Amino acid sequence: MTGHDSDDEELTLSSSTLDALKQFYAERDARAEQFAKLKAQAEEQHAAAATNAGQLSIEAFTEDWNESQFWYSDETASLLARELLDGATSDMTIAVVSAPSVFVALKNILNTSSPGQPKPKLVLLEHDNRFAVFPELVFYDFAQPLKLPSHLKASCDRIICDPPFLSEDCQTKAALTVRWLSKPHQQQQQTRLIVCTGERMESLVTRLYRSYGLRTTDYEPVHARGLSNEFYCYANFESSSSSWKWRQREDEGKEEGEGEGQGK
């Protein structure tokens, strides 16, 4: 066989390879169809605030580990969403920074709430443009923490932040974003703040948000597919629904022990 004859031969694929290709394209088409439906549903909810349009699901968005995406379980996302909504009014704004599963939970709760219930404004700050199916999306890159629409500055009453990476740089820049978004204290009560991140970030996080009164809570968020790092929830308030209390600090325990020893 000459080289010329070899070049003229048709390339053939094995049946198993063809089946794998067919499955790949079928899954791709199904995912595209799912996103189209989700986008239509999100737009419908935004325009008409329909109460029976069905539940949105974070499962429509496959986790991208390159984006450090690890979705919360539905139970955790709903709990955090309800804490953000507790006592909120319709003239408030809730910002969700790098925690899209909580944003989806907020959308579902507000979408199914009874008529007359307060419906605060939502804004999602997220790097993943797949979430552009939601009109509330604002593109966010923690490396440029203040590169955001000017109308969001000092506009948010409640904020949840889950920095994508367990690094001092990422945590510090995310804190800059939170400060930029927060309403000044003199205008209202202090911004209600929740930060969810690794246990090893505890000393840094509580220092970065000291002015907010942020403390470690006894609630540990659960991720849908598990997470090897120990994860904490930090907040500047204790839950009125008993979802969490603040953990006792070491210095508090020492002071209490000294007080008991004095016998007063």
What is the predicted function of each stretch?
Residues E168-S243:
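C-terminal substrate-binding/active-site "lid" region of AdoMet-derived donor-dependent transferases
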Residues D91, S155-C156:
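Local beta-strand N-terminus motif with an aromatic residue
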Residues S241-K264:
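Flexible, glycine-/basic-rich loop-and-beta segments that form/coincide
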Residues L110-K153:
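Adenosine-cofactor binding site in Rossmann-like domains, unifying the SAM/SAH pocket
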Residues M1-P120, L227, E256-E258, Q262:
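S-adenosyl-L-methionine
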Residues C156-Q171:
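A short SAM/SAH-binding and catalytic strip from SAM-dependent methyltransferases
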Residues A105-Q117, P135-L137, S203-G213:
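Short, aromatic/basic amphipathic alpha-helical patches
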Residues A99-S101, L124-F131, G198-E202:
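Short, polar loop motifs at secondary-structure junctions
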